[in-house]
Amino acid sequence: KTIDQARAGYGPKVDLNLGYGREYTKNPATRPDSETLTRGEASITAKQMLYDGFYTKSEVDRTSAAANSAGYAVTDISERTSLQAIEAYLDVLRRQDLLELTQTNLQSHETIFSQIQQRAESGVGRQADVEQAQARLSLAQSNLESQLGNIEDARTNFQRVVGIMPEDISNPGDDCCDKAPATLDDAIKIAYHQHPMLRSALADHEASLAQENAAKSAFHPRIDLDLGASANNNVDGEPGKDKGLYAMFRLQYNLLNGGADMARVEQIEHLSEQQKELINRAKREIALEVRLAWNALENANNRLPGLKQRVEAAEKTREAYASQFRVGQRTLVDLLDTENELLSAGIEYTEVYYDRIYACYWLMQSMGKLLETMAIEQREEAITVANQEADTE
């Protein structure tokens, strides 16, 4: 609507004036007498701007840039909010997987405890082994209770961010990671071109430049086309009807305004310089965010293969130790330690696995591409300006 208001300056202004009443007149034309007449007035005027020093164009540019800035700001907020929702979503998945690991670990400890207890009751095992197995079983039960609390916390946080409780959620996989750029430099270039925070700052600067041009229009003349028609009755003490038509070109040129116009221009120029600094600050913040997300993704990518190998090795070790324990080649402590090692390896792998997925979405958000990656519609204003600038560049 503000853009429409600015564009209205291109159109004509038409006014209708009507008047009816009594008029008392005593002037040289009526002296020594006076006249009291019933006065009637009717007129219509039309004014069309022909030249205003590009004030109207500048106002249209300013309001358009301001609208685009607001659109990009909304997109930026949407991207950040979406990332928070993704983080909460992945945290629920993470806690579910960790819960499954602790449940499996508890089942293994229950099986071991049952076997050790049976051996002790039959006189083959020692009571100390039973107590050792009981202690590890209690720890596994405690770990399970802890994970149950963690998953409830994750579900509650998801509801706080998204507004609903998570139901039937699934692992998003590597779809987002497959869309990551090849290099850090590529990621920063994309962010400089597309990030809504930077686009908003650039649009604000465009608005300040347009505002500066609007202020400079005060140094130009204004030219209007004026058209008018009138039909009056009993005016100024003269009985009878009075009709008239006119068509005029009018030029208005301010010669002196006490320096107010120049002061206004200088004020806006200062504002424009401030907007440039905000653009530079936005670039620095965006580049930093991209680097942090990139480093997080690289770190996870580098760690995952080794952690996966650790889990596989821990599984093989547990199977081997279980077989060796049954023939007396391994102690109970050795067997219990393999269960804890497998749990520890699984937990660390799961943590880094979901850290990697989150880092992929974080990288997309830091580049301003998260909504696009998730196929979420953006504000029309932001898309229009982004496409125009992409064509220009």
Model-inferred region functions:
Residues 1-6, 77, 81-102, 111, ...:
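Amphipathic alpha-helical coiled-coil segments
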Residues 43-45, 89, 224, 248-250, ...:
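Membrane-embedded beta-strand positions in outer-membrane beta-barrel channels/transporters
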Residues 147, 196, 352:
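Metallo-beta-lactamase
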Residues 39-41, 87, 132, 222, ...:
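Transmembrane beta-barrel architecture of outer-membrane proteins
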Residues 125, 130, 134, 164-228, ...:
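Amphipathic alpha-helical coiled-coil scaffold segments and their short linker/junction regions
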Residues 13-36, 47-76, 199, 218-245, ...:
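Small/polar (Gly/Ser/Thr/Ala-rich) solvent-exposed segments
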Residues 80-190, 293-296, 300, 341-342, ...:
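Periplasmic alpha-helical coiled-coil/stalk elements that build and connect Gram-negative outer-membrane
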Residues 24, 348-393:
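Acidic, low-complexity, intrinsically disordered peripheral segments
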